[in-house]
Structures are given as structure tokens and as C-alpha cells.
């Protein structure tokens, strides 16, 4: 295979793209990146986005995975124009319901001589390669290409059932990739390949191009891992056009690999590839989609943060880079934090509540079902917390102490390390100063003024040593929402009880 740059073709006028996952596991970031780029191309060109399911592998496919894929797309806001659950002119949109279509096309290919019956077993193919001095992994050798009817009958008499193979032409196969430019496969580099198993089951090598042809897909955007199958599909497409099944050859674009830790290709089994794990940790869809868009594409050289509307306006698959892209969790989290900060305060709260309920911090999983006090505290806390969290899963750690009415919060290990030898004296001085503050004056500014005078000006403590123990008393954490605002939210009784509680434990 050879690649030549600067030969990327123009897109057709009425773009039709598709997303066609197999339901074989939990949705992963590579799958979502494929869906996102196809969706963005369709929306940018005002084309059509088709969503179908490739579920012909009964051993690996599951209904649970099928439902998870739909759940993932719905959560991300990736909608489709034709396909699963919305219908369209070319259904059904699950391959498991299209068996008769594949049988009919396979029969036409066989009758026209584009496909042929192959009786060779894998063991026989390997033995012939070894005998001829070829590597065991050389692949199929074309042995069955020109079997006579007598030879076929003899194999059938032995109880053998044939697979169907496509007859590859003895010529180079080339195409202009939308991302990589001109790609050429030399004659003989791709052996005749199976499209129907001996038991009659159609393979991906048949079902995928047939579905694309019958659904009039004219732009195929998919992962680099499928690049080696493209010459097979191009040849099959030529045959389908001859048979009247397809009208035209689609354009192909192969997106770069997504790499994980250690510069290895990101695997479905790698934790960072699990879409729902990222959702559970508190990624919002805007942040995750923004980051996934950067895996091979950029909106501008000096800009990483953008909305999906902005992506749609600018996206062109021909701008996608061919080089592998690395999934950097830290950068993804950083971009997610930017999008969290851009949420309207009430939207931030609405999205945070399910995480707060999951973590046992509030009484219900929706804003409207919360108690009046919970809503009051969260509304006051939102402007303090929203700029400081990177993931919605971090909100509970920030607001838990504000919602709690406990008089003493056990400090976590990190917070305990911040308590120096001066902590008892600092707490004694803080308790004495704050005890004199009237309920009506228990406000952020007066609390700051009171503690600053008692601890810094009169006590001579540096701010970190002065306010650190007070912060630990209020939240049990080293990092928390702004201290004086937090003290106002919890109120004098709770704040004083926490200060005294920590002092008693030192």
C-alpha cells in the first residue's frame, strides 16, 4: 500500500454518511469520535446522517450493547436523520433483519461470476502455502477459482459446504482518500476473500458494502483500522454497480488511530476508552465532544475550546489529520472544566444533582424534588463551586460540607497534613473572635474582617497558617469553596460547632 498526498477529492453535493457500529460492548471513545465526525460532516454540508446497526455476529452481539449505543448517542446529542428508531426509505436498519437482502445479492454475484464457491478449509490453505514455500499467514491462494462442476460435486459428496469468495482482479486498486490522499494497493496484494460462510451466514465484507450501496451512502468515514479492507470493498462496489445494486462508488476517508497510554492504540478494554466511565466521573457532553473533536481535527491553530455549533460551521473531513491522535485524559478534563464554567448556573445545578444524589449528599436526583433547604444552599453555593470543579463528580466534595448540619467533620488525610503546631491556638483565637459576631452580622465581609484582624493583624499568623485550620474545620478538606462565603452559608451555629469540634480533637 502506498499513499500520495494532495489528491483528496471534492465532496458530493448531497452528502450521505453513516454510523454503523456493532453492538459488542460498552460504547468507547473511538466509536463516538467516528459518530461525531460523520454527524458533523452531515450537519456542515446539510446532508443526511444514517444510523444503522451491524449485528450479524450472534456470538458477540448483545441487546444490552445495542441499547447502550442508543443511550450514548442520545446523551451526547448526536441525532440522526434516517435509521434506528426514526425509520427511513431504506430499512430495516439492523443487519440481523436484512438476511434475505444479502442472500439475494450473494446469489447475483455468484451467477455473474464475480463470486465463486470455495471448498478449501483453513488447514488445506495453510498446507498448500507451506508446500509452496510461502509463509503460513500468506492467505488464500486462489485454489478454488476455477473448479469444475465435477470437482464441486466431489466436494459436496464428502459433505463439504462451500463458502463464497469474491474474485479479485489481477490489477492495482487505487482510490483518493478524503484524509490521506491517493492510496494504491498492488495487484495480488489482496487475496480473494470470503463474503458468505459455508453455513450461509453473510460476513461484514458483504453486508457493509451492500448496506452502503442500498442506503445510497456516498461518503464513508471510518477508522484507520478498516483501511486494509477498502480495496476489497472498492472491487465489490464495482460489481454491485454492474449488477445495478449500487449507483456510484462512495468516497472513503480513514480517520487516524486514537492512541492511549504508552503510545499504544487505545483498546476497548482500556478504562479511558469507556464512554460511560467518563460520564460517571462527571464529564458533560459539551466538554467530551469538544475534546473528541480534537482527536485528529482542530477548529483553529490557537484554539481548543468550542461549541458543537461552531464545530458544525467549520468542520470539513478533508481537514482531519492522518497522524495518530493521543487520548490525553488530563487535557480532556481541562476542556471539560471550561465547558462547565460556561453553563448557566441553574443548568450547572440541574446537571449536578444526579451526581450529588448518587454520592449521598442530597435527598433526590432532580432539582425539583430537592428540599427547600437543599435548593437554597446549592443556589448560594453554585457561584462558589462552578468555577472550581473540572468534573461534575467533584461537586459533592465541594458542597457536602455546606449541605451538612454536622457540628464536627472528620478531616481527610490531606487536610490533616495542613494542620501545623499552631492550629490549636489559631482555632482558640478564631472561636473567641467569632463568638462576638452577632447573628445579623454573620456575613462574608464581616467574617473576613473579624478573622483577619484576630488571626493576622493581632495574632501575627501568616494567612495560610491563620485560615488553614478554619478551612479544615469548615469542610474537612484542604481544598474547598471560598472560606468566608462557606461560613455564611452554613450559619453561625454550625460554623462555631465545627470550629469547637476540631479544636477538641487536636
UniProtKB/Swiss-Prot annotation:
'KMSKS' region (motif): residue ranges: 265-269
This enzyme's EC code(s): 6.1.1.17
Keywords: Aminoacyl-tRNA synthetase, ATP-binding, Cytoplasm, Ligase, Nucleotide-binding, Protein biosynthesis
Xref: InterPro entries: aa-tRNA-synth_I_cd-bd, aa-tRNA-synth_I_codon-bd_sub2, aa_tRNA-synth_I_cd-bd_sf, Glu-tRNA-ligase_bac/mito, Glu-tRNA-synth_I_codon-bd_sub1, Glu/Gln-tRNA-synth, Glu/Gln-tRNA-synth_Ib_cat-dom, Glu_tRNA_lig_a-bdl
Catalyzed reactions: tRNA(Glu) + L-glutamate + ATP = L-glutamyl-tRNA(Glu) + AMP + diphosphate
Positions that bind ATP: 268
GO terms for cellular component: cytosol
Pfam family, one: tRNA-synt_1c
Motif ('HIGH' region): 21-31
Single GO biological process annotation from the record: glutamyl-tRNA aminoacylation
Subcellular location, principal: cytoplasm
NCBIfam families, sorted: gltX_bact
Complex and partners: Monomer.
Family, similarity comment: Belongs to the class-I aminoacyl-tRNA synthetase family. Glutamate--tRNA ligase type 1 subfamily.
Descriptive protein name: Glutamate--tRNA ligase
Organism: Bifidobacterium adolescentis (strain ATCC 15703 / DSM 20083 / NCTC 11814 / E194a)
The encoding gene: gltX
Amino acid at each position: 500500500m502506498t499513499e500520495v498526498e494532495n489528491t483528496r477529492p471534492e465532496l458530493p453535493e448531497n452528502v450521505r454518511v453513516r454510523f454503523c457500529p456493532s453492538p459488542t460492548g460498552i460504547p468507547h471513545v473511538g466509536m463516538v469520535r467516528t459518530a461525531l465526525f460523520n454527524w458533523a460532516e452531515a450537519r456542515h454540508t446539510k446532508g443526511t446522517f444514517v444510523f444503522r446497526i451491524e449485528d450479524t455476529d450472534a456470538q458477540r452481539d448483545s441487546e444490552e450493547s445495542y441499547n447502550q449505543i442508543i443511550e450514548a448517542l442520545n446523551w451526547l446529542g448526536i441525532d440522526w436523520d434516517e435509521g434506528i428508531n426514526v425509520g427511513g426509505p431504506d430499512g430495516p436498519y439492523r443487519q440481523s433483519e436484512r438476511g434475505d437482502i444479502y442472500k439475494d445479492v450473494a446469489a447475483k454475484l455468484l451467477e455473474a461470476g464475480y463470486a465463486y464457491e470455495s471448498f478449501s478449509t483453513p488447514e488445506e490453505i495453510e498446507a498448500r502455502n507451506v508446500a509452496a514455500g510461502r509463509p503460513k499467514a500468506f492467505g488464500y491462494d486462489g485454489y478454488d477459482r476455477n473448479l469444475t462442476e465435477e470437482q464441486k460435486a466431489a466436494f459436496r459428496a464428502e459433505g463439504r459446504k462451500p463458502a463464497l469468495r469474491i474474485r479479485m482482479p489481477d490489477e492495482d486498486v487505487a482510490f483518493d482518500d478524503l484524509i490521506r490522499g491517493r492510496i494504491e494497493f498492488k495487484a495480488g496484494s489482496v487475496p480473494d476473500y470470503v463474503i458468505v460462510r459455508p453455513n450461509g451466514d453473510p460476513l461484514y465484507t458483504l453486508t457493509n458494502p451492500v448496506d452502503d450501496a442500498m442506503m445510497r451512502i456516498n461518503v464513508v468515514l471510518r477508522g484507520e483500522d478498516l483501511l486494509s479492507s477498502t480495496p476489497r470493498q472498492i472491487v465489490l462496489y464495482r460489481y454491485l454497480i454492474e449488477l445495478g445494486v449500487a449507483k456510484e462508488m462512495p468516497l472513503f476517508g480513514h480517520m487516524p488511530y486514537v492512541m492511549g497510554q504508552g503510545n499504544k492504540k487505545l483498546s476497548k478494554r482500556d478504562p479511558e476508552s469507556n464512554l460511560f466511565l467518563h460520564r460517571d466521573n462527571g464529564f458533560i457532553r459539551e466538554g467530551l465532544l469538544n475534546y473528541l473533536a480534537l482527536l485528529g481535527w482542530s477548529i483553529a491553530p490557537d484554539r481548543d475550546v468550542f461549541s458543537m455549533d461552531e464545530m458544525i460551521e467549520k468542520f470539513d473531513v478533508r481537514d482531519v489529520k492522518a497522524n495518530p491522535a493521543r487520548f490525553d485524559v488530563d487535557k480532556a478534563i481541562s476542556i471539560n472544566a471550561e465547558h462547565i464554567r460556561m453553563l448557566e448556573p441553574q443548568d450547572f445545578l440541574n446537571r449536578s444533582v444526579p451526581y450529588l444524589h448518587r454520592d449521598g449528599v442530597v435527598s433526590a436526583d432532580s432539582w425539583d424534588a430537592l428540599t427547600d433547604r437543599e435548593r437554597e444552599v446549592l443556589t448560594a453555593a453554585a457561584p462558589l463551586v462552578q468555577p472550581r470543579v473540572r468534573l461534575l463528580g467533584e461537586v459533592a466534595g465541594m458542597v457536602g460540607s455546606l449541605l451538612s448540619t454536622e457540628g464536627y467533620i472528620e478531616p481527610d488525610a490531606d487536610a490533616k497534613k495542613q494542620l501545623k503546631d499552631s492550629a490549636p491556638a489559631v482555632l482558640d483565637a478564631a472561636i473567641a473572635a467569632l463568638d462576638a459576631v452577632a447573628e445579623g452580622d454573620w456575613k462574608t465581609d464581616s467574617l473576613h474582617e473579624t478573622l483577619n484582624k484576630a488571626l493576622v493583624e493581632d495574632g501575627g499568623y501568616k494567612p495560610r497558617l491563620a485560615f488553614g485550620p478554619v478551612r479544615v474545620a469548615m469542610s474537612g478538606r484542604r481544598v474547598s469553596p471560598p472560606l468566608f462565603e462557606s461560613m455564611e452559608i452554613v450559619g453561625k451555629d454550625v460554623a462555631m460547632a465545627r470550629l469547637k469540634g476540631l479544636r477538641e480533637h487536636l
